[in-house]
Amino acid sequence: DAVRPGIAIYGLRPSWEITNPLVNELQPVLEWKAQITMLKEVPSGVGLSYGHSFHTTQPSLIATIPLGYGDGLNRNLSNRLEVLVGGVRCPQVGRITMDQSLLDVTRLRGKVGLGDEVVIIGRQGGTEISADELADKLGTINYEIVTGISSRVPRLEEGINSS
């Protein structure tokens, strides 16, 4: 007998068609995080990023994270992605570029700062964003999301017993 764990080693459901009740016990272990590297107050009516695909509709606080399509953050998520900052869902705005993405953190004004953690996949507080959520937005599967995270993104293993 052999076992082929595949994506289950990351605690992700291999397929929604699997009926084995044990698949419901899988818990995601992969997290994808970044940190805020810049904060900027932007007036109403300003177009952001390449092509100005997003325009502010009010004075806004915009955060930059050093994560883009070169890191595996699919460009087709532009203006459709939400991330977690301080446990609050915040929209990504403008086009995702090769090395950076912009976030509208206006609702966190006065509570957000440089270096704050941003969760792309994972849990923060009581809120979670899953690889399946991103896959649904792109019309694909969770495998494509997690295997698309490029080698530019550092990998850290936590809770591994090295003895």
Regions found by a protein language model. Name each.
Residues 1-163:
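Active-site anion/phosphate-binding pocket segments in diverse small-molecule metabolic enzymes
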